[in-house]
Curated annotation (Swiss-Prot):
Pfam family, one: VP7
Highest taxon listed in the record's lineage: Viruses
Binding site for Ca(2+) 1: 95, 206, 214, 216
Taxonomic source organism: Rotavirus A (isolate RVA/Equine/United Kingdom/L338/1988/G13P12[18])
Keywords attached to this entry: Calcium, Capsid protein, Disulfide bond, Glycoprotein, Host endoplasmic reticulum, Host-virus interaction, Metal-binding, Outer capsid protein, Signal, T=13 icosahedral capsid protein, Virion
Name of the protein in question: Outer capsid glycoprotein VP7
Main localization (coarse): virion
Membership in a protein family: Belongs to the rotavirus VP7 family.
Entry's localization field: Virion; Host endoplasmic reticulum lumen
Binding residue positions for Ca(2+) 2: 177, 228-229, 231, 301
Subunit structure: Homotrimer; disulfide-linked. 2 Ca(2+) ions bound at each subunit interface in the trimer hold the trimer together. Interacts with the intermediate capsid protein VP6. Interacts with the outer capsid protein VP5*.
Amino acid sequence: MYGIEYTTILTFFVSFIILDYTIKTLTRAMDFIIYRFLLVVVILSPLLTAQNYGINLPITGSMDTAYANSTQEENFLVSTLCLYYPNEVVSELNDDSWKNTLSQLFLTKGWPTGSVYFNEYSDIASFSINPQLYCDYNIVVVKYSTELQLDISELANLILNEWLCNPMDITLYYYQQTDETNKWISTGTSCTVKVCPLNTQTLGIGCLTTDTETFEEVATLEKLVITDVVDGVNHKINLTTATCTIRNCKKLGPRENVAIIQVGRSSTIDITADPTTMPQTERMMRINWKKWWQVFYTIVDYVNQIIQVMSKRSRSLDAAEFYYRV
């Protein structure tokens, strides 16, 4: 009996020694593998690069104070700037290397060669309806035009903000605007818009719903119309549907990576004083018209101050994606 007990104890003791030895062996092997792996990582780390997915903090500021002509010390190595201008610029400058000249001048303000893009447009009205704004920062240069002098605030409103729009069936339905961010936007070759406000019994207020001649005319033969009526009141709408389309639009918010520079003479209507564009006045500037070279020199001088009141692109390469959605 004692022999069996001694044998059991001896077996247990030997098993314990073997288990302890096995664990220590595995521990030494794991330590060897881990330390070798860390050594390889340390050696290769300086040779590897990786993408840093950080958070883009918006650039904020105020342009209530006078602009200062400054040169940015650090380069905008990860930013792009698009400058949009009317196509008449090319013919007036008559210089095949004007873009290269401006690129070199932007370089003195901290914008590397290749980070500034020049894009021309033929018609500011068409451009504002479907703006293709591809850069981190976008500056739109708008020259004063007598044909569009009363539309410039509406154009600025379209460019500086993102809109969500849906088609309207004015032959079947009455429409009302819910708040100040709700507008009716009409576009086409010739838009004449008339409205008839309705009371709670759907009877015309100062007009007859059956006679469009009694409707109030809010726009005549225009290419772009942003109609703003009394909120919370149903309206019957009459429109030249053959040459114009109308959409019910909601302003989603500002395009904070877009700024407008208005170029004009002393008689130019100042859009920065318009109540429809007042919330964006810090992203609207005016340059008195002289020559296009003078305009561009001024833009180069003050580009960094303009950028400081803008926020870098954060949602889409194509701003039109947020414009007309059906």
